């Protein structure tokens, strides 16, 4: 599989209740890009991400990872390349211990036990929670759960990391740790978030969704400097671009 391009073409998704969540989404992301997907609640961000490794199937259009279409028959191959971190880490952590959760993916690849242990150790070390390997996930803090959820994906050695609201609910210290971890991941990153200051720091490109459509796609600073666009899409400038609330500078 060529890992250099994530391509979404005329992607539409309609839920069983008739809700049109995505309406003709088209974009291309090259290997190594760090791209944010932003928009108001209900704009279609999470629905879009769930198509990138086949958790949802399109009503119309298609998604490709390199030359490989994301369809039922290619899901094992696609999911080795595209690692998905869900918004709620409790959706991702379901085994008795942290080690078991992080080992789950590599074991299902049929890797030898020694390789599984190496991958688990490396992934936990990368996210700074190696000391938690024997703990049950329900005993972890929110920030610890978030890091372990990322480790479950890193243990699969993905080329593309997809994250849905990775800093939601974290205290400032845990948020900064997660941002440092994501900054160190050198492959492709696709991130949805309402944390626009994080987006400013981590993503050179931003795609704005509005009512299931792409409203804008371009350099992050240009997007957040367009007040008319932000108002139309029910967004605001990041705090770092708003200036001092007292003196206006």
UniProtKB/Swiss-Prot annotation:
An annotated GO BP: cobalt ion transport
InterPro entries linked: AAA+_ATPase, ABC_transporter-like_ATP-bd, ABC_transporter-like_CS, ABC_transpr_CbiO/EcfA_su, Co_trans_ATP-bd, ECF_ABC_transporter_ATP-bd, P-loop_NTPase
GO MF terms held by the record: ATP binding; ATP hydrolysis activity; ATPase-coupled transmembrane transporter activity
EC number from the UniProt entry: 7.-.-.-
Domain of life: Bacteria
Keyword Chaperone tagged: no
Domain ABC transporter: 6-236
Gene Ontology CC: ATP-binding cassette (ABC) transporter complex
Binding site for ATP: 39-46
SMART domains: AAA
A Pfam family: ABC_tran
PROSITE patterns: ABC_TRANSPORTER_1, ABC_TRANSPORTER_2
Membrane topology: Peripheral membrane protein
Record key words, sorted: ATP-binding, Cell inner membrane, Cell membrane, Membrane, Nucleotide-binding, Translocase, Transport
Keyword Iron: no
Compartments where found: Cell inner membrane
NCBIfam families, alphabetized: cbiO (TIGR01166)
Family of the protein in this entry: Belongs to the ABC transporter superfamily.
PANTHER family found in the cross-reference section: ENERGY-COUPLING FACTOR TRANSPORTER ATP-BINDING PROTEIN ECFA1, HEAVY METAL TRANSPORTER
Annotated function: Probably part of an ABC transporter complex. Responsible for energy coupling to the transport system.
Protein name: Putative ABC transporter ATP-binding protein GSU1281
Origin species: Geobacter sulfurreducens (strain ATCC 51573 / DSM 12127 / PCA)
């Amino acid at each position: 599989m060529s890992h250099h391009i994530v391509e979404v073409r005329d992607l539409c998704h309609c839920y069983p209740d008739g809700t049109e969540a995505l309406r003709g989404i088209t974009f291309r992301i090259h290997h190594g890009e760090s791209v944010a997907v932003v928009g108001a609640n209900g704009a279609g961000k999470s629905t879009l991400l769930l198509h990138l490794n086949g958790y949802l199937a399109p009503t119309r259009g298609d998604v490709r990872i390199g030359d490989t279409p994301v369809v039922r028959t290619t899901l094992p191959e696609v999911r080795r390349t595209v690692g998905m971190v869900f918004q709620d880490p409790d959706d991702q952590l379901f085994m008795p211990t942290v080690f078991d959760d992080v080992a789950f993916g590599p074991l299902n690849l049929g890797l030898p036990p020694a390789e599984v242990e190496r991958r688990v150790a490396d992934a936990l070390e990368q996210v700074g929670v190696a000391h938690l390997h024997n703990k049950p996930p329900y005993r972890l803090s929110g920030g610890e759960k978030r890091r372990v959820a990322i480790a479950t994906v890193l243990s699969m050695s993905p080329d593309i990391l997809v994250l849905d609201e990775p800093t939601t609910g974290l205290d400032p210290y845990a948020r900064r740790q997660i941002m440092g971890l994501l900054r160190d991941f050198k492959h492709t990153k696709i991130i949805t978030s309402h944390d626009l200051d994080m987006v400013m720091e981590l993503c050179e490109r931003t795609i704005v969704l509005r009512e299931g459509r792409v409203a804008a796609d371009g350099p992050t600073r240009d997007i957040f400097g367009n007040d008319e666009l932000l108002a139309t899409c029910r967004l605001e400038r990041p705090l770092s671009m708003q200036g001092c609330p007292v003196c206006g500078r």
